[in-house]
């Protein structure tokens, strides 16, 4: 059974006009390695920590500024939201299609809230806490190409022609602001698009981005802004002591106009200085140590890296299943070809290397979780190949071969072919990232014994489900298994309304 909304009635939850206040018993374990009777042994001790959560229920008017607004992802997301807001339908060769938000965790997935008369009851994910309605989001942003969004949509060739014709009047007047362009960080083949760039030193470029954010906020009368990078994949930046290893050194490097400070890092600096959440949707190391240092000291949300939309999402599910079933993956070979501008940019070795790192690390935590299967330091052979094939456009082909060892020396091979409509998969993920980033800025918590409420750590692990290479605070374990990431996100939001984590025990029927 499906219900549209619900309210929790519990002595641990209080609803007021301004907030939802919950008291939550967090049950976890601590491990102790101790000597007993002359030998060391591991002892697992269950413990309960009481937490309080406070969620501001005022839903702000949200502005979203995309870096790379005129790219395939930016034009697809903007057009998709307009189509939903306006209730647009269009003819395909199969049927009359209605606009929807399929592919969005917040808008098109459900959570289990309990059972009634022997039937499980589900509610929309977005009903857990008050969230921004995507139809109300105001879009803007930057792009090194000055093409308006209607023409960018046509260039992308993602939407059906009938839909493009209906969207064009809404999008013709949308023109990206000039963007930061540094040819050293992206493929040379992007130079022909760069007709809309911010001039000046790196310090002047940061100042211009700050000015742009303030003017966008004022012009559109939005309460909050979230900025997200959906522009070209950059090459990795060199992390050097004295250059970008601390906040102070990063600022000094900007003042010296050091060449190794990337455009994405400049956007992130501007956002942090404005206390605007910044999310990196590409695989490069935007968040150099000095930038993370700055975000922590300013307590400004940052998240990333790289949208998890197609092949990698499948991989984080399949390898988790195999290792969890006691099957040993020994070889993972992933081949991709695509024909959009992302593929064109990734044809350069230095930008491909960023993507290769992002895609290759996704199985690490699953492998390290099972020392029965893997010796210390042992790891599956893992190869990632990406090729640019212009004809296929945005329809990325992903082919994977998984070879595993099974019972008594046997071998098992799984081969997958996945046609990933790149931007149609990425656009709802971008939407989820900005909506959840905004929501998380309205949540405060404190553990028993802490005097004051505080926000989540600025490095937003809560967004991990949506990214290939989750950014985590220093010293925090990286979790890539998709089911664990979704459970973490859902259970944190459940805690905010005093609901227990979904453990699937269903003891009442045992």
Swiss-Prot record:
SUPFAM superfamilies with a match to the protein in the record: Glyceraldehyde-3-phosphate dehydrogenase-like, C-terminal domain, NAD(P)-binding Rossmann-fold domains
Pathway: Polyol metabolism; myo-inositol biosynthesis; myo-inositol from D-glucose 6-phosphate: step 1/2
A GO biological process held by the record: phospholipid biosynthetic process
Main location as per UniProt: cytoplasm
Top-rank EC class of the record's enzyme: isomerase
Subcellular location as annotated: Cytoplasm, Cytosol; Nucleus
Keywords assigned by UniProt, alphabetized: Cytoplasm, Inositol biosynthesis, Isomerase, Lipid biosynthesis, Lipid metabolism, NAD, Nucleus, Phospholipid biosynthesis, Phospholipid metabolism
InterPro entries according to UniProt: Myo-inos-1-P_Synthase, Myo-inos-1-P_Synthase_GAPDH, NAD(P)-bd_dom_sf
EC number: 5.5.1.4
Residues that, per the record, bind NAD(+): 70-73, 143, 180, 190, 193, 230-233, 281-282, 306, 309, 340-342, 355, 393-394, 422-423
Reactions this protein catalyses: D-glucose 6-phosphate = 1D-myo-inositol 3-phosphate
Cofactor(s) of this protein: NAD(+)
GO annotation, cellular component aspect: cytoplasm; cytosol; nucleus
Recorded GO MF terms: inositol-3-phosphate synthase activity
Nucleotide-binding in keyword set: no
Family under the similarity heading: Belongs to the myo-inositol 1-phosphate synthase family.
Role, per record: Key enzyme in myo-inositol biosynthesis pathway that catalyzes the conversion of glucose 6-phosphate to 1-myo-inositol 1-phosphate in a NAD-dependent manner.
Protein name in the entry: Inositol-3-phosphate synthase
Source organism per UniProt: Nicotiana tabacum
Biological classification of the source: Eukaryota, Viridiplantae, Streptophyta, Embryophyta, Tracheophyta
């Amino acid at each position: 059974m499906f219900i549209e909304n619900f309210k929790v009635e519990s002595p641990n939850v209080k609803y007021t006009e301004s907030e939802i206040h919950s008291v939550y018993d967090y049950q976890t374990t601590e491990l102790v390695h101790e000597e007993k009777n002359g030998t060391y042994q591991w002892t697992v001790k269950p413990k309960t920590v009481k937490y309080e959560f406070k969620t501001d229920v005022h839903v702000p008017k949200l502005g979203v500024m995309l870096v790379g607004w005129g790219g395939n992802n930016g034009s697809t997301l903007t057009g998709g939201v307009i189509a939903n807001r306006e209730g647009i339908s269009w003819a395909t060769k199969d049927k009359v299609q209605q606009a929807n938000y399929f592919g969005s965790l917040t808008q098109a997935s459900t959570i289990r809230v309990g059972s009634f008369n022997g039937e499980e009851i589900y509610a929309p994910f977005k009903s857990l806490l008050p969230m921004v309605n995507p139809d109300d989001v105001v879009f803007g942003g930057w792009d090194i190409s000055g093409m308006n969004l209607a023409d960018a949509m046509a260039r992308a060739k993602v939407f059906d022609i009938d839909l493009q014709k209906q969207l064009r009047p809404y999008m013709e007047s949308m023109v990206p602001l000039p963007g930061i362009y540094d040819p050293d960080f992206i493929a040379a083949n992007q130079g022909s698009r760069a007709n809309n760039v911010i001039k000046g030193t790196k310090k002047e470029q940061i100042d211009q981005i700050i000015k742009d954010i303030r003017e966008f906020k004022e012009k559109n009368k939005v309460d909050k802004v979230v900025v997200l990078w959906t522009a070209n994949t950059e090459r990795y930046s060199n992390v050097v002591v004295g250059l970008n290893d601390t906040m102070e050194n990063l600022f000094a490097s900007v003042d010296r106009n050091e060449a190794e400070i990337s455009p994405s890092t400049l956007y992130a600096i501007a956002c942090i200085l404005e206390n605007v959440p910044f999310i990196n949707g590409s695989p490069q190391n935007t968040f150099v140590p000095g930038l993370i240092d700055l975000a922590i000291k300013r307590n400004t949300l940052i998240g990333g890296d790289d949208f998890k939309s197609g092949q990698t999402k499948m991989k984080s599910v399949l390898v988790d299943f195999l290792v969890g079933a006691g099957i040993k993956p020994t070889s993972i070979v992933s081949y991709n070809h695509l024909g959009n501008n992302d593929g064109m940019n990734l044809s350069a070795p230095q930008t491909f290397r960023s993507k290769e790192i992002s895609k290759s690390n996704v199985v690490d935590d699953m492998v390290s979780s099972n020392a029965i299967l893997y010796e210390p330091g042992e790891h599956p052979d893992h190869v990632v190949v990406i090729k640019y094939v212009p004809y296929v456009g945005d329809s990325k082909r992903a082919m994977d071969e998984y070879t595993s060892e099974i019972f008594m020396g046997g071998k098992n091979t799984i081969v997958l072919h996945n046609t990933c409509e790149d931007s149609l998969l990425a656009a709802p993920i971008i939407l989820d990232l900005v909506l959840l980033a905004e929501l998380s800025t309205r949540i405060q918590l404190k553990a028993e014994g802490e005097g004051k409420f505080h926000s989540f750590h600025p490095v937003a692990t809560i967004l991990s489900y949506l990214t290939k290479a989750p950014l985590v605070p220093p010293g925090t374990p990286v979790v890539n298994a998709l089911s664990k990431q979704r459970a973490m996100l859902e259970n944190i939001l459940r805690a905010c309304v005093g609901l227990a984590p979904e453990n699937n025990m269903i003891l009442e029927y045992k």
